[in-house]
Curated annotation (Swiss-Prot):
Its main location: cytoplasm. Residues 8-290 form the tr-type G domain. This is Elongation factor G. GO terms for molecular function: GTP binding; GTPase activity; guanosine tetraphosphate binding; translation elongation factor activity. Keywords: Cytoplasm, Elongation factor, GTP-binding, Nucleotide-binding, Protein biosynthesis. One of its GO terms (cellular component) is cytoplasm. SUPFAM superfamilies: EF-G C-terminal domain-like, P-loop containing nucleoside triphosphate hydrolases, Ribosomal protein S5 domain 2-like, Translation proteins. Catalyzes the GTP-dependent ribosomal translocation step during translation elongation. During this step, the ribosome changes from the pre-translocational (PRE) to the post-translocational (POST) state as the newly formed A-site-bound peptidyl-tRNA and P-site-bound deacylated tRNA move to the P and E sites, respectively. Catalyzes the coordinated movement of the two tRNA molecules, the mRNA and conformational changes in the ribosome. It is found in: Cytoplasm. One of its GO terms (biological process) is ribosome disassembly. The keyword Disulfide bond does not apply. The keyword Cytoplasm applies. Gene3D superfamilies: 3.30.230.10, 3.30.70.240, Elongation Factor G (Translational Gtpase), domain 3 (3.30.70.870), P-loop containing nucleotide triphosphate hydrolases (3.40.50.300), Translation factors (2.40.30.10). The lineage of its organism: Bacteria, Pseudomonadati, Pseudomonadota, Betaproteobacteria, Burkholderiales.
Length: 700
């Protein structure tokens, strides 16, 4: 079966934004204009097509990135038909992992900003992730019809807060209730959308007299940005003082794909203005799978290889999302990087060393699905019936094995005990939690060895609330949830040259004998546990060294101060002894555990606590109280910015343990007018009095 849409006409894009910037409404309008859905689903009444999980419809926030396919021929039908695969990403900080996952498989992104709120905290997080995966992007300033809307202020904020290089390619005509359309700076014409047709029709007009000088000035900046794409364009621009429309487009495209500039547009998705122009820009300025570098990976021998976006290459794809569907079971969303995958094919998962047979392949339109017989390079689709694949794993042709780079997922910073309400819930809860953990790698499930309780861990209070909510809705599990617990860590501050561990049991017959001497030293922050074998002369036989490493890895799960996991320690095995008859792996493992614990006690152990980057947006009247309150929570206030629509944005770093219940305090302090976001920043040493309290609480 031949490819319906040539690969150069594919666009795999993400739509990313802060909560309430109007991202879901923007996606809805895209689906409407591309003719996929004929009734515009409004977020306000919980009917948006992309927000397909029940809680999202209630909370009005987007939680899981749904993947949708649509087609576009241009606002004035001037392009050949292009295929746009859209990944809708969440804007709430607790779901940052979803954004990270979708960034990994995108070729381009469209950042949606609110014309009133401007660049908000989550916008910065998403921007950093897009930088990490080198995703070319456009910016769309939404909600131009709202009171306080200011397009040019958002342009300045992007430069200041994101260190971006925004290049407006349209400017607004009017603002707030007088926003009527945009000036297209390439055509130097005003675009006015027809409200009766919900923006499906539009007309070109002359630029209003009051805007002509401003349009000329912004056009010059845009042409200059385009000219910098190549020497040829620059020379023409210097000689003639201008470029043709096609030259501007090709220059802007080259620089956008290279990540040097971010073309900017504006509109109001809710009032059906501007989204159509943004779709044109997606096609004109964002890359196709052929424009981005081949995806890197490793073959069986761990040699670096790449896979090109080409149907003729061997098949390779990355599983970037798992979802449980009530009707078809497990859906595994994949991005195909090379080759073709047909129903019934067998693929290989190099991470697990297993083969899997592909049952059905479906392409999603939000949560409506269409079955397809095959998918090709550049496609995004969901496979049904894969048993043993988790997020971030590679699927490839069994004859050409490749592991595409793995995604790295953060450790949870907050934990809660969860107990089923009845015996019947007990069995269902295990199944529910393991399914949810497979879908979401930033959510972890473990058992507390002392109390036997089930512990769930995640990236924030809202994250865990939604998990418990999903257990109830999707799996019918009623559960009681304990108080949130902070995920503390332990580490050391001093080096201990000789930490000796001995495990000897000799009382007639075959005994046990293991003896190790370890050097224990602090490691760089974030480096984790490093084990180095420095044994010379066989004083500890080769076959027992893995057992020593295993012992160290077991010992680090419980620190010596309060039993929290130990991080960032370098352990060197440099001496020891053995017994010809009595030595075995168990004895050396135990010796390593004893040696490590003994060494840690002498290495100035400390407790680390998670520090959160907190940003509070508040009316100016309450700024002083907010800062005082953050300081009383052991917070370090790092700065205060003016917000686009008035008010202050206060940035601070605060220990997570001090932030429980903060939303209630903030609400009462500001009469419900302040909001905040919080995300994990790093671990930091807890002050002595806090440390002592933590140790005392654990000892009870």
């Amino acid at each position: 079966m031949a490819r319906k849409t040539p690969l150069e006409r594919y666009r795999n894009i993400g739509i990313s934004a802060h909560i309430d910037a109007g991202k879901t409404t923007t996606t809805e309008r895209i689906l409407f204009y591309t003719g996929v859905n004929h009734k515009i689903g409004e977020v306000h009444d919980g009917a948006a097509t992309m927000d397909w999980m029940e809680q999202e419809q209630e909370r009005g926030i987007t939680i899981t990135s749904a993947a949708t396919t649509c087609f576009w021929k241009g606002m004035d039908m001037s392009f050949p038909e292009h295929r746009i695969n859209i990944i809708d990403t969440p804007g709430h900080v607790d779901f940052t992992i979803e954004v990270e996952r979708s960034m990994r498989v995108l070729d381009g992104a469209c950042m949606v900003y609110c014309a009133v709120g401007g660049v908000q905290p989550q916008s910065e997080t998403v921007w950093r992730q897009a930088n990490k995966y080198r995703v070319p992007r456009l910016a769309f300033v939404n909600k131009m019809d709202r009171t306080g809307a200011n397009f040019f202020k958002v342009v300045d904020q992007m430069k200041l807060r994101l260190k971006a290089n925004p290049v407006p390619i349209v400017i607004p005509i009017g603002a707030e209730e007088h926003f009527t359309g945009v000036v297209d700076l390439r055509k130097m014409k005003a675009i006015i959308w027809d409200e009766a047709s919900q923006g499906m029709k539009f007309r070109f007009e002359d630029i209003p007299a009051a805007l002509q000088a401003s349009a000329k000035e912004w056009r010059e900046k845009m042409v200059e940005a385009a000219a910098e794409a190549s020497e040829e364009l620059m020379n023409k621009y210097l000689e003639e003082g201008d470029l043709s429309e096609d030259e501007i487009t090709s220059g802007l495209r080259a620089r956008t794909v290279a990540g040097e500039i971010q073309p900017m547009m504006c509109g109001t998705a809710f009032k059906n203005k501007g989204v159509q122009r943004m779709l044109d820009a997606v096609i004109e300025l964002l890359p196709s799978p052929l424009d981005v570098p081949p995806v890197p990976g490793f073959d069986e021998d761990d040699k670096a290889v790449t896979r090109r976006a080409d149907d003729g290459e061997k098949f390779s794809a990355l599983a970037f999302k798992l979802m449980t569907d009530p009707f078809v079971g497990q859906l595994t969303f994949v991005r195909v990087y090379s080759g073709v995958l047909a129903k019934g094919d067998t693929v290989y998962n190099p991470v697990r060393g297993k083969k899997e047979r592909i049952g059905r392949i479906v392409q999603m339109h939000a949560n409506e699905r269409q079955e397809v017989d095959e998918i090709r390079a550049g496609d995004i689709a969901a496979c049904v019936g894969l048993k043993d694949v988790t997020t971030g794993e590679t699927l490839c042709d069994p004859t050409a094995i490749v592991t595409l780079e793995r995604m790295v997922f953060p450790e949870p910073v907050i934990r809660q005990a969860v107990e089923p309400k009845s015996k019947a819930d007990q069995e269902k809860m295990g199944i529910a939690l393991s399914r949810l953990a497979a879908e979401d790698p930033s959510f972890r499930v473990s058992t507390d060895e002392e109390s036997g309780q089930t512990i769930i861990g995640g990236m924030g209070e809202l994250h865990l609330e939604i998990i418990v909510d999903r257990m109830r809705r999707e799996f019918g599990v009623e559960a009681n949830v304990g108080k949130p617990q902070v995920a503390y860590r332990e580490t050391i501050r001093k080096t201990v040259q000789e930490a000796e561990g001995k495990f000897v049991r000799q009382s007639g017959g075959k005994g046990q004998y293991g003896h190790v001497v370890l050097k224990i030293e602090p490691n760089e922050a974030g480096k984790g546990i490093e084990f180095i074998d420095a044994i010379k002369g066989g004083v500890v036989p080769r076959e027992y060294i893995p057992a020593v490493e295993k012992g160290v890895n077991e010992a680090v799960t419980q620190g010596v101060l309060a039993g929290y996991p130990v991080v960032d320690v370098k352990v060197t095995l440099h001496f020891g002894s053995y017994h010809d008859v009595d030595s075995n792996e168990l004895a050396f493992k135990m010796a390593a555990i004893f040696g490590f614990k003994e060494g840690c006690k002498r290495a100035s152990p400390v407790i680390l606590e998670p520090m959160m980057a907190v940003e509070v947006e508040t009316p100016e009247d309450y700024a002083g109280n907010v800062m005082g309150d953050l300081s009383s929570r052991r917070g370090m206030v790092q700065g205060m910015d003016d917000m686009v629509g008035g008010g202050k944005a206060i940035k601070a770093e605060v220990p997570l343990s001090e932030m429980f219940g903060y939303s209630t305090t903030l609400r009462s302090m500001s009469q419900g007018r302040a909001t905040y976001t919080m995300e994990f920043k790093h671990y930091s040493e807890a002050p002595r009095n806090v440390s002592e309290a933590i140790v005392a609480a654990r000892a009870k």
